Regions:
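Active-site metal-binding core of divalent-cation-utilizing nuclease and nuclease-like domains
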Residues: 1-25, 31-35
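Non-catalytic C-terminal interaction segments of nucleic acid-processing enzymes
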Residues: 20, 33-126
C-alpha cells in the first residue's frame, strides 16, 4: 500500500531490487495509441509528478511504441519505452529507449542511472 499521493492513476507502481538499493517506477501498458490531446494531458501529469521519478511505457507493437514515445520527446522526466513481449522474456534486461540520453539501454541501467548504451540497429526508431 502506498502512503503518498500520485499525479496519475498508473497501471502499476513497481519496486525492484538493484544491487544494494530499491528502484521504484510507474508502469504503463499501451495496447493502442491515444490522441495527441490525451497524451498532452498525460505528459502534463507526469511532469507534475513529485512522488515518482522514473516511468516505463510498455507497448504492444512498434507502431504504438513510436507514437507513445514521440509524445514524450521533450519531457523533462525520465520516461523509458519498451515492448511488452520483451518485458515478459527479459524483465530488467529489457531493452528500452530513453529520451533523456537518446539511446537504447537495459532497463536495469535506466533505473540505476547508468548511461551504458546497448547496440540497436539505427532504423529501429527511425
Amino acid at each position: 500500500m502506498m502512503d503518498f499521493a500520485i499525479a496519475k492513476d498508473y497501471d502499476a507502481i513497481v519496486t525492484v531490487r538493484l544491487e544494494e538499493r530499491d528502484a521504484t517506477f510507474a508502469l504503463e501498458y499501451e495496447r493502442s495509441a491515444k490522441s495527441e490531446t490525451q497524451y498532452a494531458e498525460i505528459v502534463d501529469k507526469i511532469e507534475s509528478e513529485i512522488e515518482i521519478d522514473r516511468f516505463l511505457y510498455l507497448a504492444s507493437s512498434e507502431q504504438v511504441l513510436r507514437c507513445v514515445s514521440w509524445q514524450f520527446r521533450n519531457s523533462k522526466r525520465h520516461v523509458c519505452f519498451g515492448f511488452l513481449a520483451d518485458w515478459y522474456q527479459r524483465l530488467l534486461d529489457t531493452e528500452v529507449f530513453d529520451w533523456k540520453c537518446h539511446q537504447y539501454r537495459p532497463l536495469r541501467a535506466a533505473l540505476s542511472g547508468s548511461t551504458y548504451p546497448i547496440q540497436v540497429p539505427s532504423q529501429a526508431f527511425a
